[in-house]
């Protein structure tokens, strides 16, 4: 059996609020293999967003280990985590987080700038991914010229553009049309 794509062991995440410590994640163990689809479900306040932030390398655990694609990311510094996020993780946010005065093509190509691709490589790959989500005819439109479902598909295309190891999506089908 191949190494898991994600392996977290005894992950804990605490937050200090004034004089109080809030124990949000209390020793989570999880393994996700390549090709698996996993849904995090639970009531509000159960720690889903906190776990997603840890899995997405947007936060680090209070304790425990997180191995992502063979690399221990649990103790990495911010600049190392930024590189991991750009290369390994695609995000689809519930609110899309698209740049409002930027075309769909440029919104999708944005992560490739940070990955060091040339403008021609960015445009070619972003065009390819926008075609995959059936938005070839809307590439030059800004977000306010797109429906909610089209904006969601731009966000999905942006998550896919760097060919990440994992996709983290917050309610990814909530606005599709």
Describe the function of each predicted region.
Residues 4-177:
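ABC family nucleotide-binding domain
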